């Protein structure tokens, strides 16, 4: 290895999946590897193997999984909104539960530190472990090795627990304030938007570095032998208008607004209605809500919007399922899309937006907060819907948006002009050059602490005999 290269471990509750954290971790691994660093992964669950990391360096630590028995046990006790019938505890009992939680986290921390020692890890990059309590034991474990053992730690925050109603009401706020995220000297913090940077500075008094979500515009998705049959494989005709929602099915994505948008469009342009196919490409994710899925299905049925849930055929990398059927990536799906919808009420950044841009797909989006602070101003073109909601909580959709959608779907030169412009803007502002600069600057600025951590770890491995 080069003199200034490091052994880096990516730590996450889950990797190899299609959620935003997993996808960004994949990109960081790609960049870090290309810069000469040796990469390890430590995860509670691998949906698929992580590309670019040797199998023997993909370490499974089940206790930090989002679905571990310990996580399910503790989260139902400390987050009342996660239960239909939340338990009630006396203060002494709650103190016992927190002590039990911290003890379990400490045990996981000891195991994690052993992994760091055994593999001589110089620095860990903690992917959202100390921002969102999807893995309470993982968050405690990372906090302990960063503060007790002083292992060089970069906290990569994608979103925060206080932004989620299901976590904002809790019985362990003091603990969460301490570890999610911590503000200890010697650690480094990275956020994905200027808005998150402002909030973290205000709340935690730390000065995070902003490295936005980026997309690989240098290697854009193109039609090839693997994805050429996507339409026929999934039962779509060549002249069907595929409207793709390239997100997981969770309430903050406001998929009901996308359904209403298409219902309005089909009513306004009945000559195109029979060709509309609304596709949701990803699964529920880690914010399970069966009622929400049923609500979406029911709304689509009432409005006559043909709805297709194809998550079982979409994965983070190309493969085949147990029945021998092709698994397509989100990019494979998007290059067959005629239009994408992306109408969230809240997003940490906007992976789906950038994926659509990189695949040269026009996209209808809301002007959600981070879009306004970090994306809107760089010059993308396309239909935008202001984030205004009526008294019933429905997105207010102006007729002008329907007109723009119609032109995109019926005027090919106009569509091509938009997507080519957006591709150039995306490549300049959110391409891998931006990511390379952000990551290399981060590692360079933190390198003294990483080297000090390497020396401390080396000393910890020394045996002394008396």
Question: Whereabouts are the PLM-identified features?
Answer:
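Short hydrophobic beta-strand element within catalytic cores of glycosyltransferases
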Residues: 362-366, 371-376, 382-383
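Aromatic "clamp/platform" in nucleotide-sugar-dependent glycosyltransferases that forms part
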Residues: 345
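A short, active-site helix/loop in glycosyltransferases that binds the activated sugar's phosphate group
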Residues: 170-221, 225
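Nucleotide-activated donor-binding/catalytic signature segment of Leloir-type glycosyltransferases, i.e.
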Residues: 282-284, 290-333, 379-381, 386
